[in-house]
């Protein structure tokens, strides 16, 4: 009698931290370079989008049980928050910031992320739960879009376009992460599927109905107050200035 190989392996394997980061760096870097070549963004915006896309590539692991990965992820989030706050203070409020304030503000933002936001996430999340879902990525993307929109001049079409791009890069990085996790759940050499298959790339964590409902309501609200889309679609549809090779 011929025995069939087991469908599920006893030990789960998933993409590690470096794989997630490096893949997100490559793909989002190429994407931002493409937008730069087409004239949709300038170099400063391209670098910022690349940074956000790389963070998006780590975003689902914000519920990680690994303290080292969690430290790195939250440090990157804190850095992003610090840069956004300083950008808002110096460009939108148009005030001079003293040396002491330049030290105190980042420390306050970092402390808020580390001692308030992080414990909340650790308390309400489990690994490969709500954070490993399309609903969570969409929520984060729309939230990033809204924050960027509010921190910039809302009267210009360029601001709306850039706001949508920031959210898009967060979403792109997150999708890369989830796809990698699912790819690592399939053993192509033995044609077997690991037990972790299907736990990463899912619409929502329906086991946690309260968080899922809250996420849906938040997404609906963010869509309602989102920046205009028509100008963004029109701008990003023009690829006449794109140069692949000069």
Label for each model-derived stretch:
Residues 2-246:
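N-terminal membrane-targeting hydrophobic helices
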């Amino acid at each position: 009698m011929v025995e069939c190989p087991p469908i599920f392996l006893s030990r789960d394997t998933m993409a590690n931290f470096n794989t997630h980061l490096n893949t997100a760096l490559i793909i989002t870097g190429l994407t931002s370079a493409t937008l730069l070549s087409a004239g949709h963004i300038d170099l400063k915006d391209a670098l910022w989008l690349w940074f956000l896309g790389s963070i998006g590539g780590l975003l689902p692991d914000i519920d990680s049980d690994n303290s080292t990965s969690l430290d790195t992820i939250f440090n990157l989030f804190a850095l992003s928050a610090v840069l956004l706050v300083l950008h808002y203070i110096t460009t939108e409020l148009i005030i001079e910031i003293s040396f002491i304030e330049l030290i105190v503000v980042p420390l306050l933002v970092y402390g808020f992320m580390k001692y308030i936001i992080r414990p909340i996430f650790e308390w309400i999340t489990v690994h490969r739960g709500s954070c490993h879902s399309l609903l969570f990525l969409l929520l984060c993307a729309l939230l990033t879009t809204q924050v960027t929109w509010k921190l910039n001049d809302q009267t210009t079409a360029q601001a709306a376009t850039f706001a949508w791009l920031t959210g898009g890069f967060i979403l792109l990085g997150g999708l890369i992460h989830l796809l990698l996790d699912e790819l690592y759940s399939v053993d192509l050499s033995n044609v077997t599927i690991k037990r972790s298959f299907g736990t990463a790339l899912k619409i929502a964590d329906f086991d946690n109905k309260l968080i899922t409902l809250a996420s849906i309501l938040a997404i609906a609200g963010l869509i309602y107050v989102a920046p205009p889309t028509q100008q963004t679609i029109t701008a990003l549809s023009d690829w006449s200035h794109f140069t692949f090779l000069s």
